[in-house]
Amino acid sequence: MSVRLVLAKGREKSLLRRHPWVFSGAVARMEGKANLGETIDIVDHQGKWLARGAYSPASQIRARVWTFDPSESIDIAFFTRRLQQAQKWRDWLAQKDGLDSYRLIAGESDGLPGITIDRFGNFLVLQLLSAGAEYQRAALISALQTLYPECAIYDRSDVAVRKKEGMELTQGPITGELPPALLPIEEHGMKLLVDIQHGHKTGYYLDQRDSRLATRRYVENKRVLNCFSYTGGFAVSALMGGCSQVVSVDTSHEALDIARQNVELNKLDLSKAEFVRDDVFKLLRTYRDRGEKFDVIVMDPPKFVENKSQLMGACRGYKDINMLAIQLLNEGGILLTFSCSGLMTSDLFQKIIADAAIDAGRDVQFIEQFRQAADHPVIATYPEGLYLKGFACRVM
C-alpha cells in the first residue's frame, strides 16, 4: 500500500481545480512513512484519491503533484510522455522562429514540477529544484538519453532554493561532452555566446527573447541605456535595430566581456557600444546629477524578492530604480522595464511604475506589455507560472 498524505477537511479545493501544490497547512496527517522526494498519494479527509505527487517534509510546499490520473505511475515512461508533449510545442516554435535554443521544460506548466530544462544547440541544461525532481533524477535522465541521444546533458542545480528542501547544490556534466566555455546560439538573427557552466541560471535568459526583439522597433537613431545588461542580448538587439549608441551597465566584468564579444560576433559597430562596470542604482544617480539624457532605457534587474516578507522592500527598490530611469529620459523617450519576481503581480508592477513617474515629476503612457517568451508557457491552473512581466512606457 502506498504512503498517503491526508488533507484536512475542506482543503482539497485547490487540487480539485488542478493546482499542483499542497501547502503544509492543508495537511491533516501522513499515513505511512515517505522519504524526501518520494512519490505519495494525496487523498481528502474521507480518503478519496485526488492526486499523486512528490513529498517534501521540510518545505512549505509539502507535496508537488506529478499527476491527477490515478492510473499513471511515476516512472521512465511517465517522463518520456511529458517530454514528448513538451517537445511538440517547442518544435513548432523552433521552426516558426528559427530557434536552436529554447526552454524545453518549464516546471509545473509542463507537468514536471521543480524541473527546468533548457536546450542550447545539442546541450540540455538541467535544473532540479525540488525534492521530488531530485528523487526522480535517474528516471528523468534515462528518458532524456532515449529521446535526445544527440545531446549532452549538463547539471546546473546549483540553486539556493534546493537548500530549502534539504538538498545539496549540484553542478557538472551528466552525460556527453563538457560544454565549451562559450557556446554560440542564434536568436532572431543574432549570434550570442552562452556560458553554460558559469553563467546565470542555465547560462542565458531565454525568457526575454521576444522582449529583446521588440526593443528594435524603438531604438532607430536613439541613444540607449541598457541596465543590468548581463551578456548584452538587449544591446546587440538595439544595435541591430539601428541605435546611435548603447551603454551597457553591469557589475560583472565577465558578463560585460561576453557582451563585447557578442557585439563583435555579429559584426556590429563596436564604436557605438559602451560597456560600464558599475552599480546601476549608483550610476543612474550619477548620470542624473550630471545631466545625462537617453532616448531609450532598458531596465531588466535580477529578482528583487524571494518571499512575501521581502515584497515591500522590493517594491521600494523597483520604484526607486524606475523613478531614476524616468528622470533620465528625454521627452518622448521609452522605458522598457521588467520584473522577473513571481510575487510581483503585473498590476502591482504597473502601479509601482505609475508611482515612480509621479515621484519623477513626469507623465508616463503605457504603450506595450511584455511577458516571458512562448517556450515558457503558463498552464491555466498554475498562474504562479507567469513570473516575468514588463512594460514599454512613453515618458512625456
Swiss-Prot record:
GO molecular function annotations of the record: RNA binding; rRNA (cytosine) methyltransferase activity
Matches recorded under PROSITE patterns: PUA
Subcellular localization: Cytoplasm
Start and end residues of each PUA domain: 2-81
Keyword Hydrolase (UniProt): no
Enzymatic class: transferase
Family listed: Belongs to the methyltransferase superfamily. RlmI family.
The keyword Protein biosynthesis appears for this protein: no
Source organism of this protein record: Escherichia coli (strain UTI89 / UPEC)
Name of the protein in question: Ribosomal RNA large subunit methyltransferase I
Catalytic activity annotation: cytidine(1962) in 23S rRNA + S-adenosyl-L-methionine = 5-methylcytidine(1962) in 23S rRNA + S-adenosyl-L-homocysteine + H(+)
HAMAP family named in the record: 23SrRNA_methyltr_I
Gene: rlmI
Domain of life of the organism encoding this protein: Bacteria
